[in-house]
């Protein structure tokens, strides 16, 4: 079938298998150009492994180090001529490329928040890897059903204590708009922490440790975004910020647990990129469009694979990691360059409907958004029929 992009709001409802595969190959090629990652991990578990930063971590570990990988994700398979999700096709392509190079790859498809998927993952580690020496936690989900209580918590993107008016882009109509966000209630804050805080990461590490599948010296990291002044009302000072602070508290306990066996636990702070999650946040398309414009002009623009490849080389497996005062690994240094942030702030209120395409890189933002779903990738013939029914080998469901 011939598959074209169909966008509704912040979701593209179609995906292109060949485009997703080409995107994965591009990321692998980038890692290969950088050369081997010294002293990297050998057996890696990535929780949230099918898109964005999690996929980039799996690619960097496999093709930069030669690591065996186990990926956990929650994706929809193709069915009845309806394409699967982008993460499904990304993972299928990853498996194909890993097999071509003789690299061990296993995947588990299901709800990472559940006890069932944790148990299936542990069984797969025992069978295929024995133990893991790196656990990457990169889960982005709007809701979580708690495995112990059965309560489903919904995350909320709201300020705390007062309403906030945010500038942004109506991406459907390509117009500047303002959104008034009311403050979160205490219950909404607690629910957001339950979804996006550190509890599930801790549950994963506790379960892996109790099962004996964490190697001595194992490391774990959870990915997060903090941002700077322009995004603080909605991130660090908002309901999501409370979840991020919970992540900071959680990592201290995990670090103590792993340090006893020569290991480590860190929160890794990454730069703002286009993801399905970020595109749904009212101010982020405008912020990203401005950030892309400024960073591309300076030659410092990076995407997921550049960020995570650099994180492994320069911090996670470096003798001189980039660490902030709170002990977080920082890969977002170029985004937070004072000159970059000053220029973004300078342009922020100048953007109008008329100059959207000149003051910002909204065109680049839109292109990156479509790339998430396999569209706009160099070398792919989008007028040619493509087979949507792609399977993932070594998949546990």
From Swiss-Prot:
The family classification in the record reads: Belongs to the TER reductase family.
A GO MF annotation of the entry reads: trans-2-enoyl-CoA reductase (NADH) activity
How is activity regulated here?
A: Inhibited by triclosan.
Q: What is the recorded phenotype of mutating residue 245 to A?
A: 3-fold decrease in affinity for DD-CoA. Loss of reductase activity
Q: Where is this site: Plays an important role in discriminating NADH against NADPH?
A: 75
What does the entry list as the binding residues for NAD(+)?
48-53, 74-75, 111-112, 139-140, 244, 273-275
Can you say what this protein is called? Enoyl-[acyl-carrier-protein] reductase [NADH]
Gene3D superfamilies per record: NAD(P)-binding Rossmann-like Domain
Summary of subunit composition and partner proteins: Monomer.
Gene symbol here is fabV
GO annotation (BP), single? fatty acid biosynthetic process
Keyword terms: Fatty acid biosynthesis, Fatty acid metabolism, Lipid biosynthesis, Lipid metabolism, NAD, Oxidoreductase
Pfam families, per the entry: Eno-Rase_FAD_bd (PF07055), Eno-Rase_NADH_b (PF12242), Enoyl_reductase (PF12241)
> What reaction(s) does this enzyme catalyze?
a 2,3-saturated acyl-[ACP] + NAD(+) = a (2E)-enoyl-[ACP] + NADH + H(+); a 2,3-saturated acyl-CoA + NAD(+) = a (2E)-enoyl-CoA + NADH + H(+)
pH profile of the protein: Optimum pH is 7.9.
Upper lineage: Bacteria, Pseudomonadati, Pseudomonadota, Betaproteobacteria, Burkholderiales
Pathway this chain belongs to = Lipid metabolism; fatty acid biosynthesis
Q: What is its EC number?
A: 1.3.1.9, 1.3.1.44
| UniProt-reported outcome of changing residue 244 to R | This mutation causes a small decrease in the affinity for both DD-CoA and NADH, and a 950-fold decrease in catalytic efficiency is observed
Carries keyword Cytoplasm? no
Positions of transmembrane segments: none
């Amino acid at each position: 079938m011939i598959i074209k992009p169909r966008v509704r709001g912040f979701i593209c409802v179609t995906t292109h298998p060949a485009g997703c595969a080409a995107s994965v190959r591009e990321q692998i090629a980038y890692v290969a150009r950088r050369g081997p990652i010294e002293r990297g991990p050998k057996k890696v578990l990535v929780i949230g492994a099918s898109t964005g930063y999690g996929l980039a971590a799996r690619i960097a570990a496999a093709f930069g180090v030669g690591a065996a990988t186990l990926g956990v994700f929650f994706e929809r398979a193709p069915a009845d001529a309806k394409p699967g999700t982008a993460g499904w096709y990304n993972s299928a392509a990853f498996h194909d490329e890993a097999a071509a190079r003789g690299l061990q790859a296993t995947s588990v498809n299901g709800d990472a928040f559940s006890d069932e998927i944790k148990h299936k993952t542990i069984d797969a580690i025992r069978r295929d890897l024995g133990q893991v020496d790196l656990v990457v936690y990169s889960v982005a989900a709007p809701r979580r059903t708690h495995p112990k209580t059965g309560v489903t918590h919904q995350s909320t993107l709201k300020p705390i204590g007062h309403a906030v008016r945010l500038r942004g882009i109506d991406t459907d109509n390509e117009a500047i708009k303002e959104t008034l966000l009311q403050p979160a209630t205490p219950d909404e804050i607690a629910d957001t922490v339950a979804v996006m805080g550190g509890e599930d990461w801790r549950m994963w590490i506790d379960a892996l440790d109790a099962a004996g599948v964490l190697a001595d010296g194992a490391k774990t990291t959870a990915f997060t975004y903090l941002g700077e002044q322009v995004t603080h009302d909605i991130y660090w000072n908002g309901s999501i910020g409370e979840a991020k602070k919970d992540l900071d508290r959680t990592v201290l306990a995990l670090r103590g647990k792993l340090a006893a066996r020569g290991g480590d636990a860190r929160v890794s702070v990454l730069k703002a990129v286009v993801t399905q999650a970020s595109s749904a946040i009212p101010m982020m398309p405008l912020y990203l469009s401005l950030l892309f414009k400024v960073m591309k002009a300076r030659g410092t623009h990076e995407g997921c694979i550049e960020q995570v490849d650099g994180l492994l080389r320069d911090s996670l497996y470096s003798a001189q990691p980039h660490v902030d005062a709170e002990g977080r690994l920082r890969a977002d240094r170029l985004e937070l360059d004072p000159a970059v942030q000053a220029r973004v702030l300078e342009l922020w209120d100048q953007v109008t409907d008329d100059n959207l395409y000149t003051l910002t890189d909204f065109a680049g933002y839109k292109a990156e958004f479509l790339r998430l779903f396999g569209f706009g990738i160099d070398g792919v013939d989008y007028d040619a029929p493509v087979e949507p029914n792609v399977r993932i080998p070594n998949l546990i469901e």
